Amino acid sequence: VGFKAGVKDYRLTYYTPEYQTKDTDILAAFRVTPQPGVPPEEAGXAVAAESSTGTWTTVWTDGLTSLDRYKGRCYDIEPVPGEETQFIAYVAYPLDLFEEGSVTNMFTSIVGNVFGFKALRALRLEDLRIPPAYSKTFQGPPHGIQVERDKLNKYGRPLLGCTIKPKLGLSAKNYGRAVYECLRGGLDFTKDDENVNSQPFMRWRDRFCFCAEALYKAQAETGEIKGHYLNATAGTSEEMMKRAVFARELGVPIVMHDYLTGGFTSNTSLAHYCRDNGLLLHIHRAMHAVIDRQRNHGIHFRVLAKALRMSGGDHIHAGTVVGKLEGEREVTLGFVDLLRDDFIEKDRSRGIYFTQDWVSMPGVLPVASGGIHVWHMPALTEIFGDDSVLQFGGGTLGHPWGNAPGAVANRVALEACVQARNEGRDLAREGNEVIREATKWSPELAAACEVWKEIKFEFD
């Protein structure tokens, strides 16, 4: 009688290879690198314990609850091919451990404490399976892909964007001028850089006003709906909401948020506001590489992408496969599908550890940006398909003739690639030829092709 005090082996309680996972469990795949001498079963069980009900010693209050009902369970361990010291530990968490509709709580539970654990040399969360029973407690993206196309009246092609550069230092009026020139030239969107908030050289309200003026002028002249991602990110959630409200009063179609630096709680509040008030929400992933770049420690971006779809956002940056920032093709396409599709089959070659069923949650448009230019257009059109936003910052504003011709060059290149694809041509093989043909009737594109013909972002 009573309880047996003392330190216990985690694997005795939390390593349960016979466990059959339930449809309502949240499943996690962790890449575990145990300290030398720690068996994988003990390390896997330690992860399950520390990210659910466990603590380092037996406590008498364990007797006041049903551990079997609430504990996380490490139900499978497999070696990582080519890595002697690493294992994939699969952990199942009962749904009752999590607050409904809170990405914040989900992450605090699953990754909050366990990453500093002494028995582990390194730990990486590779994937999460979110059951419909949990995902249904989230609103998800404010509008989603189809509603966005209907709002913008743009179909059958990727959308084109451009980040205004230099990202810091322009006055609000000059900033608005650059926005106007890009939109007038043929882009669908322009974008505040992620670190443009409200600095001494350009306060947020001035920027919002000049950008709204720019996009209305461009709309009137082109007959197309235009948008500028007004960055509402701020030092407090209240200030962020104030900026979003002002954007809505200006009648603009879209605002923006840095969801990792701003935090999931703020992001979810903003997403709810955006749905209630007809604003689209563009999400930038500033700070993601701090979390996801190491191969053996941190959180893979596909998990951050899933979390964003639950928290809410209509666009999110997803790497390029071809530009200046890292991204392996198959893995990138894996999380692009996780953002856009309703149902994604388990496929380890693309890094997808679990079959994910989003049921009817709206999709998110992946945004390709970072060091891309007109010569990349065929590859981007083929890799990302129609449901994407292609963002050329330097690839627009770096045009030798100026911003508007830079925008024209990108729009012509995109239309040429979409037309070629619709005619059944193979963009992977004939892409350069398609662009060259298009230069014949677009001097702007010809000039862009000349400037960027030699650029490569490859570091061997």
Swiss-Prot record:
Domain of life: Eukaryota
Annotated keywords: Calvin cycle, Carbon dioxide fixation, Chloroplast, Lyase, Magnesium, Metal-binding, Methylation, Monooxygenase, Oxidoreductase, Photorespiration, Photosynthesis, Plastid
Record-level GO BP terms: photorespiration; reductive pentose-phosphate cycle
One term of GO molecular function: magnesium ion binding
Residues bearing the modification N6-carboxylysine: K191
Gene3D superfamilies (UniProt xref): Ribulose bisphosphate carboxylase, large subunit, C-terminal domain (3.20.20.110), RuBisCO large subunit, N-terminal domain (3.30.70.150)
Stretch forming the signal peptide: none
Binding-site residues for substrate, renumbered to this chain: N113, T163, K167, R285, H317, S369
Cofactor binding note of this UniProt entry: Binds 1 Mg(2+) ion per subunit.
Record PTM N6,N6,N6-trimethyllysine, positions in chain: K4
Location (main, coarse): plastid
Record's GO cellular component terms: chloroplast
Top-level EC class as recorded in UniProt: lyase
Binding-site positions, Mg(2+): K191, D193, E194
A Pfam family per the record: RuBisCO_large_N
Residues marked Transition state stabilizer (site): K324
Cofactors demanded by this protein: Mg(2+)
Annotated function: RuBisCO catalyzes two reactions: the carboxylation of D-ribulose 1,5-bisphosphate, the primary event in carbon dioxide fixation, as well as the oxidative fragmentation of the pentose substrate in the photorespiration process. Both reactions occur simultaneously and in competition at the same active site.
Family according to the record: Belongs to the RuBisCO large chain family. Type I subfamily.
Protein name: Ribulose bisphosphate carboxylase large chain
Gene, per the UniProt record: rbcL
